[in-house]
Curated annotation (Swiss-Prot):
It comes from the Eukaryota. This is Translocon-associated protein subunit gamma. One of its GO terms (cellular component) is Sec61 translocon complex. TRAP proteins are part of a complex whose function is to bind calcium to the ER membrane and thereby regulate the retention of ER resident proteins. One of its GO terms (biological process) is SRP-dependent cotranslational protein targeting to membrane. The lineage of its organism: Eukaryota, Metazoa, Chordata, Craniata, Vertebrata.
């Protein structure tokens, strides 16, 4: 049986590995899929009110395309977040280190080892990078998706039947942001 100190060290290592992995927590997944569903459903209003596609007659089409688009947009969120997280962590490292060191100096830090201080700084840096990368990923992908839908709908596919216009503009927009998100920028 492993000693308790080794078990604690293993759990700390697992937490660090989890922070740098591509896997999302349940909270992040819910946030991404919730936002992706909302932004994917917005074009329904556009096609219902402007292109006069009936809600009831097109309900199945709206549902299928919204679900497909939700998956692709959430996929783009995840990829962009992962790429940005490390860049943000590098840029914010000095500021986060100063803030954590200042807070620790205000508190009683004489009892704290250098390793524990470094772990707190790393944890805070990772938390800040995760938050900033998540919010920027959602903002960037939502903006790009909605701009692509509007451009495709009103300019590129304006002479198509509204049903074909909807299918092509939603699938092309969500597919394009999912494709663009796979690049390493």
């Amino acid at each position: 049986m492993a000693p308790k100190g080794g078990s604690k060290q293993q759990s700390e290592e697992d937490l660090l590995l989890q922070d740098f992995s591509r896997n999302l927590s349940a909270k992040s997944s819910a946030l991404f899929f919730g936002n992706a569903f909302i932004v994917s459903a917005i074009p329904i209003w556009l096609y219902w009110r402007i292109w006069h596609m009936d809600l009831i007659q097109s309900a199945v089409l709206y549902s299928v395309m919204t679900l497909v688009s939700t998956y692709l947009v959430a996929f783009a969120y995840k990829n962009v977040k992962f790429v940005l997280k490390h860049k943000v962590a590098q840029k914010r490292e000095d500021a986060v280190s100063k803030e954590v060191t200042r807070k620790l100096s205000e508190a009683d830090n004489r009892k704290m080892s250098r390793k524990e201080k470094d772990e707190r700084i790393l944890w805070k840096k990772n938390e800040v990078a995760d938050y900033e990368a998540t919010t920027f990923s959602i903002f960037y992908n939502n903006t790009l998706f909605l701009v692509l839908v509007i451009v495709a709908s009103f300019f590129i596919l304006k002479n198509f039947n509204p049903t074909v216009n909807y299918i092509l503009s939603i699938s092309a927009s969500s597919g394009l942001i999912a494709l663009l998100s796979t690049g390493s920028k």
